[in-house]
Amino acid sequence: GHLLHEDSLTAQTTMIGSIMRAYEYMDVPGVDVLTEHNYCFWIVKQLQSAARQLGKNKMLSELYGVTGWQFDFESHKSVGDWQALFGINLRCHHLSWYSMRGEGKRDYPASISYQSAWYPYYSYVEDYFSRLNVFLEQGEPVCDLLVLNPVESLWCRIYPKWSWQLVPIDEEVREAERMYEETFRTLCAAKTDFDYGDEDFIKRMGSVEELNGETVLRIGKSVYRKVLVTGMSNMRRTTLGLLKEFADKGGSIIVAGSPPRYIDAVASDEAAKLPAVYTARENMVQALGISPQASVKDAEGREIGDIYIQLRRDGENLIAVLMNINRLQAYYGASVEFSAGGFCERWDPRSSEIRLLAKGDRISFKYDFEPSAELCLVITAEDRK
């Protein structure tokens, strides 16, 4: 299932505190993504992070609610696409009518059932998502970065009239929301995958370990080689202690922007003394020092920020899904390049066709990304024709 109001840190603080820690108690954790133009992608990223850390393989989304009868198949695909990219593999459609009787049936979108004239063709949409979901369930995620989730920093800013309903009024909270969205979009545009780390999870499931001769920070089932601290004004002392241990054993910590000014809601400069790389937020990606395994550039050689990616490793194979999250902008002749070499197969979730797209010591090819286009690839060491 899902909880009420997830779209922002303010909404979570107002209604439930922190959405991520609730997922521990759900067999199939989920979200509710309302409207056609909801671009709060981070709510699904929070769910994906918790699911990875908790070892939960199924992620639910109640989707398509509060859209409209103009909602066509392209819209069904586009709204579902980015959610599938970030792990949604159980689609709970809003909605299907039992009957058309009653005033309560004035709902949106049109019934995804026999009452709609287009319903006999809806399998085209669902077959597409079935293939995409199975594709994204293979292997394990390629994700080395943990981003501390700053929701508890907002808890310290609650006072009369700090917000109006679910909209922040407090200027510091508004800035925290802006930085939160900016961090998400900056990392995704840079083709750098990450998980959020809830401080309650870090306290109860966090540890510092050595893996293959390298220091890692573990949260439950997931391990991370780098930790990013940004957009936080408060940090738990337990989090600070684990980060100190991680740094002392050779772990990599990056603090982008101002470090937390409070520890357990008490003014402190301890976070500013962490052994870490300190940088301005605009230099965050460079300071991370993570070499992306894939890039997608336009004709001028600029990285196309609208194309997001998820990478997974399945034995010797590298699995990649690239997705143009822009519904209006096409990117023709984009240069796609991977650091990996071998044989690059395209798996088409629309038609189920598989064909060889490129090969070489370093996979590189041109591709036309239509608005809302997806590209599913498998890079193998051997030609599997």
List each model region and its residues.
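Carbohydrate-binding surfaces of carbohydrate-active enzymes
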Residues: 1-385
